[in-house]
């Protein structure tokens, strides 16, 4: 997990060899925005936010560095955090008493955690880093703050994530891969 260090009203984020240092508490999302705009995956996020909206959203997102092989979240857990993937790849798999079934590989410019984020239900799958990953997390409580303070940004984000969920549910092989 990324380190959050604070001193003299300056917040420094350390994530995968990158240090973002801004006195306003916002983080630099250039890499994420670029990953979204360059992604050709069917289930990638659409870049529905303006530069100003990305800047407003940046103060609500938390950086996460995930080494290869580490689990981001496990099937059955009740956390509702939404994750936006800037770099790396994530493996989504479902386990029961008989088998472990890989459902999808998610690449940069996409999102995971959308199922629990919207449904308030436990996670339907486990998500694990297939390679070192840089992600941005939006915990449910921070999304509530975003909704109250920047409703237009929250609506645009929900529409983009909802579109990803709809695409995944519309795709036979990814139908069970909404996490």
Give residue spans per PLM region.
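Cytosolic regulatory regions built on CNB/CRP/Popeye-like sensor folds
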Residues: 5-179
């Amino acid at each position: 997990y990324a380190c959050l260090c604070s001193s003299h009203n300056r917040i420094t984020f350390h994530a995968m060899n990158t240090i973002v240092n801004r006195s306003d508490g916002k983080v630099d999302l250039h890499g994420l925005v670029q990953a979204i705009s360059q992604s050709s995956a069917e289930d990638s996020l659409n870049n529905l936010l303006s530069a100003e909206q990305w800047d407003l959203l940046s103060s609500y997102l938390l950086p996460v560095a995930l080494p290869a092989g580490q689990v981001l979240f496990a099937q059955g857990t009740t956390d509702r955090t939404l994750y936006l993937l800037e770099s790396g790849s994530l493996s989504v798999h479902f386990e029961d008493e008989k088998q472990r079934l890989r459902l999808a590989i998610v690449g940069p410019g996409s999102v995971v955690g959308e199922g629990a984020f919207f449904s308030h239900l436990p996670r339907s799958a486990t998500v694990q880093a297939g390679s070192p990953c840089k992600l941005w997390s939006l915990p449910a409580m921070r999304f509530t703050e975003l909704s109250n303070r920047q409703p237009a940004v929250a609506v645009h984000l929900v529409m983009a994530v909802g579109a990803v969920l709809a695409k995944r549910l519309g795709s036979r092989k990814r139908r069970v891969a909404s996490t």
